[in-house]
Amino acid sequence: MKFLFDLFPIILFFATYKIYGIYSATAVAIVATFAQIGWVWLRHRKVDNMLWVSLAIIIVFGGATLILQDETFIKWKPTVLYWLFAVILFLAHSFFGKNLIRAMMKDQIKLPEPVWVRLNISWSVFFGAMGALNLYVAYNYSTDTWVNFKLFGFMGLMFVFIILQALLLGKYMEKNDNQKI
């Protein structure tokens, strides 16, 4: 359910684009992200930092799209977000000795340290590649294709990447008496 909730602004962006176009879809994405944060705040009295970052990026790039009536800015939004994720993962590990992937997942799975390092690097590279792929699609295909790719392509790639990660990690996961594998 959380997965669908996380996709809420993207799904509304997609649906609005199909009916009303890129500028209406951009406005809806901004409002939907505000609504998403409001809902999280009302339910948990705490909002994840990544949601705030996503809101800031959609306000800046979506706002520029609406004010300047130039869809280029909204097309850059996923790239900026993905590259930001990639850089944060890389810098946190390289300069601060923090493995953010381990910090997020350590309660779910137990892995040897070298595997956590590889996992962190693979996610950083994946996000970097996703950002580059977004720009490729944005600049080489129609806006219709980009919007479709933004929802279905990125979701599909993310799904495949997660499945591949799970398959690769399966051999390293430590069994625990309470955990069924």
From Swiss-Prot:
GO terms for cellular component: plasma membrane. It comes from the Bacteria. It is found in: Cell inner membrane. The chain crosses the membrane at residues 24-44, 49-69, 81-101, 119-139, 149-169. Coiled coil: none annotated. Belongs to the YciB family. Plays a role in cell envelope biogenesis, maintenance of cell envelope integrity and membrane homeostasis. This is Inner membrane-spanning protein YciB. It comes from Nitrosomonas eutropha (strain DSM 101675 / C91 / Nm57). The gene is yciB.
